[in-house]
Amino acid sequence: MILLIDNYDSFTYNLYQFIGIFNSDIKVVRNDKITIEEIEELDPESIVVSPGPKSPKDAGICVDVIKHFTGKKPILGICLGHQCIGEAFGATVSYAKCIMHGKQSEIYHDGTGIFTGLDSPVKVARYHSLAIIEKTLPDCLEIIAKTQDGEIMAVRHKDYPVVGLQFHPESIYTEHGKRMIENFVNGVI
């Protein structure tokens, strides 16, 4: 079972549908309606932290889930979930270089892990005003995708299967978003 933590976002069920193409065993829970202990009891094979409004400080249990389950379960964070990954490991999340709500832009990625099989650059959908600030990125996280102007678009933990995507792979404006989700579900992260 894949656990999808919902940060009260309208994209959560789009993400649910994409994940369901590759694994139909999904449980959706709200970020303030579950505990670490309950997640332990559920014993998901992986965890997805959804997009959402606001900042990691307002994302319920998400930062704690990332801290607790890193090294135990694969984790994918999308948009706010990506920012929660940054915050969980000590990065600063602050205003992005450019506010991007419902806009498409090209990102340049390293072609590994979640980006396996994809050309670089790839066009993605962005809906965010916050971003991980590069100069605060901890040593345990590596940047695996950026925009042309240097905004971080994806990070990966160097030792554990934890990946964050600032953009929305579940949006129709993201090229090859299904492939990215498929890579994650199949453990290619």
Predicted ranges, named:
Residues P44-G117, K123, I181-N183:
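Cysteine-nucleophile active-site neighborhood
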Residues E142-I189:
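C-terminal and late-domain segments of enzyme folds
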